[in-house]
Amino acid sequence: MIMHVAEAGERRGRVVLHLTSGHPNAIAIEAAVRIAQAFNSEIESLFVEDLQLYDLASYPFAREISLSARTRALSRDDVEKEMRLCGQSLQRRVETLARAADVPLRAKVVRDDPVQALAKACAEDGPWNVVALADALPPGQGARLSELFNTVAGTTGLMLVGPMARRTRGSIIAVVETPEHLQPMLRAGERMARVLGGEVVLIMLSDSQSSDEWLDGQVRLALGEQSRMRLLHYRTDQSAPAALAEVIRRLNGGFVIGHFGGLLVPADGDLRDLFTALECPLFLMR
């Protein structure tokens, strides 16, 4: 995890904030700063000027359509100017939040395909990176999530928010599906709880009663008899993922920590039900 590198004083422990538009989600940016603050790491704000926009502007038939339905010719110079102003504005916004949280910040601007730019940034200074997506991920864009995990190798986790995100303060909800993920999630949750406030709550997620009983035994054995941590059980055969998101909402969750490729977020990246109800950031570990 990123915390091991950050605590050792190495420069590679960082949060890479992926900025690709002029309308990032405020909760996503705040969450990225909070993760860096919790793990004593730095932030690299990576603003990507989408190369496809420049290619499009090179065509003589390219037009920009305003909200009032007016059109005008789209030139490469116009795109370059707007991108530069947008990037400067976003970098100042991130800088203000990072300074207030006493988090070191590096700013970088590249012109590339957004996913490839992220992959290159993490490969150049990795592998202990947490990627934070500044744009809210729409529920129907789960395939993009799978693409990121498959393409961007130099990461230990990915933070994202959905369109309903509204807070980062509150309980840290660790959704545990296997004993192997317990300790990394627990350490991450405890670090984040000290910064964000609230308690760490473990939700044991399974798909059958037998799996639930086995996981419960393994988790309690690992925690020890003296642990006072709040433990909850949830079986996916009971209802849809949206109902689990409702449980998290009622717990006043400020962050959810989960595992990519499991029951919470399947490998196909289907987030439709979960993101229609989730009101806090989702921190996915590999």
Indicate where each model-derived feature is located:
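Gly/Ser-rich helix-loop-strand patches that form or flank binding pockets
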Residues: 2, 11, 29-31, 107, ...
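Short glycine/proline- and acidic residue-enriched helix-loop micro-motifs
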Residues: 71-81
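A short helix-to-beta-strand connector/capping loop
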Residues: 98-106, 224-231
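Small/aliphatic-rich secondary-structure junction motif
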Residues: 2-73, 170-234, 242, 253, ...
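Charged docking surfaces used in two-component/phosphorelay signaling
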Residues: 109-117, 237-241
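Well-ordered, non-membrane alpha-helical segments in soluble/globular domains
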Residues: 87-91, 145, 216
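Active-site beta->alpha loop and helix N-cap motifs at the rims of alpha/beta catalytic domains
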Residues: 79-90, 98, 110, 114
